[in-house]
């Protein structure tokens, strides 16, 4: 009887271990980036291996606010782009990773695009804002009607927005990721992730 119970317990332990291992495996390319960065960001951040990517100099940090929110910027950008940042929030209530970049459309007008990945929901949300610079300050317009109005004013279509996203997120960030990590996924095959695009039906 004891042997039978022991065998059942062992089988149950193996099944639970396999289930735990399976649920913890990255389900998409953004999961990979999130999980691998979470493992390494306080010691030797894996993103340091990307050529031209600069980890924010305060890292690693024990500060309460900064401790779980690492970020970094690309030093070299394609022509016409002003900033490309990768950031995370490893707080349990957040569990997100983000890729944001700005593209100049006029001297004081920029397009700001955000890609926010929720590790909890496996959801990727793509959004766009308009940045207006005045002196040393920059304000962002988020209201959809106003954003669309600015885009129309400068002749920027949803096809253009998709092109900017592809050039930066797919052809740069995700390609760089695949060059430093043996990914199961690719820029053309994200894996199991729900993508929500703000401008999809504009």
Task: Locate each region found by the language model.
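A sequence-composition feature that detects small, non-aromatic residues
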Residues: 4, 9, 43, 135, ...
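Hydrophobic membrane-insertion alpha-helices, especially the h-region
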Residues: 4-22
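Extracytoplasmic electrostatic interaction patches
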Residues: 70-202
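N-terminal export/targeting and maturation segments
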Residues: 18-110
């Amino acid at each position: 009887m004891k042997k039978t119970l022991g065998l059942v317990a062992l089988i149950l332990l193996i099944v639970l271990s396999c289930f735990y291992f399976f649920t913890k495996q990255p389900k998409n390319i953004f999961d990979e980036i999130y999980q691998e960065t979470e493992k390494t960001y306080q010691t030797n951040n894996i993103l340091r291996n990307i050529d031209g990517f600069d980890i924010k100099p305060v890292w690693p940090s024990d500060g309460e606010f900064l401790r779980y929110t690492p970020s970094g910027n690309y030093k070299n950008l394609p022509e016409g782009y002003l900033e490309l940042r990768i950031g995370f929030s490893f707080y349990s209530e957040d569990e997100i990773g983000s890729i944001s970049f700005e593209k100049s459309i006029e001297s004081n007008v920029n397009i700001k695009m955000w890609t926010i990945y929720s590790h909890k929901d496996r959801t990727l949300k793509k959004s766009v804002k308009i940045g207006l610079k005045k002196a040393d300050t920059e304000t962002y317009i988020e209201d959809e009607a106003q954003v669309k109005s600015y885009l129309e004013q400068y002749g920027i279509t949803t096809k253009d927005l998709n092109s900017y996203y592809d050039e930066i997120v797919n052809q740069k960030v995700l390609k760089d990721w695949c060059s430093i990590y043996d990914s199961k996924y690719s820029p053309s095959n994200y894996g199991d992730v729900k993508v929500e695009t703000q401008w999809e039906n504009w």
